[in-house]
């Protein structure tokens, strides 16, 4: 430790001994747990954010295409079952023609979904959603009519075998010939009743199959509507995501203050 002498106005004065310089450096470093949590948050944002990842958009497109093709197939099957129902006895279900118009709207909705997948856009999305809503409404009406035919419209099917009950022809025969003719007519009636019973079961199975197809169309319509709305929401939020990405890029280009510089404090004592 040195001591300096300073002369002021001819008077010698001793200066204070110089003190050593102390520099205190504090360095703050984030813990490994904090870095792990930040990495997990970045991974979650990468996986579940709908507007930033290409696989998510492609997956939605494949789902929409598959649902559209399924709607078309179910619509064609509904029209085919309508043709089968038109060959049966008269019922409200047959007279309404619900199998045809429900199938036609389902085909239109499926075609709209495929067009929307091939040419994405807001207008195509709105048209596809409207067609899907129309298909859902028509298929719900078809379900109501089909259930009503099972509950209340059973009379034509219960008495379908009455066509076999006819009066026996009057044939002037006697003895063995008359007995043989009567047995032949009875046998024909039994065969007719058996065939009519089979036909009644067949039309009941067709109605049950049509009801199952309608239920499947309800499920597919709801799924297609959900995928379409999610796609529309993703397209609406895409400009906001692009704006946020530009802001993040601009923020990265500017030089931010270093955390180590903020946390580092230097104390110089003279």
Curated annotation (Swiss-Prot):
InterPro entries: CD20-like, TMEM176A/TMEM176B. Keywords: Differentiation, Membrane, Nucleus, Phosphoprotein, Transmembrane, Transmembrane helix. One of its GO terms (cellular component) is nuclear membrane. Residues 237-270 are annotated as: Disordered. It is a multi-pass membrane protein. Belongs to the TMEM176 family. This is Transmembrane protein 176B. It comes from Pongo abelii. The gene is TMEM176B.
């Amino acid at each position: 430790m040195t001591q300096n002498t300073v002369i002021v106005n001819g008077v010698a004065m001793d200066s204070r001994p110089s003190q050593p310089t102390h520099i205190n450096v504090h360095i703050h470093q984030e813990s490994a747990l904090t870095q792990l949590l930040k990495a997990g948050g970045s991974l979650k944002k990468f996986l579940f954010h709908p507007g930033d990842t290409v696989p998510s958009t492609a997956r939605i497109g494949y789902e929409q295409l598959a649902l559209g093709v399924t709607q078309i197939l179910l619509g064609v099957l509904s029209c085919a079952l309508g043709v089968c129902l038109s060959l049966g006895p008269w019922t409200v279900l047959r007279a309404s023609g619900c199998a045809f118009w429900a199938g036609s709207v389902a085909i239109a909705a499926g075609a709209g979904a495929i067009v929307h997948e091939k040419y994405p856009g807001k207008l195509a999305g709105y048209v596809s959603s409207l067609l899907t809503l129309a298909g859902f409404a028509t298929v719900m009406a078809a379900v109501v009519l089909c259930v009503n035919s099972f509950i209340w419209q059973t009379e034509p099917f219960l008495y379908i075998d009455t066509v076999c009950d006819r009066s026996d022809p009057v044939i002037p025969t006697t003895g063995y010939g008359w007995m043989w003719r009567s047995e032949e007519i009875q046998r024909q009636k039994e065969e007719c009743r058996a065939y009519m019973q089979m036909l009644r079961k067949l039309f009941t199975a067709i109605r049950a199959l049509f009801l199952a197809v309608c239920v499947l169309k309800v499920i597919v319509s709801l799924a297609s509507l959900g995928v379409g709305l999610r796609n529309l929401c993703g397209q609406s939020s895409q400009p906001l995501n692009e704006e946020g990405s530009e802001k993040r890029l601009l923020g990265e280009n500017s030089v931010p203050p270093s955390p180590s510089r903020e946390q580092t404090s230097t104390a110089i004592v003279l």
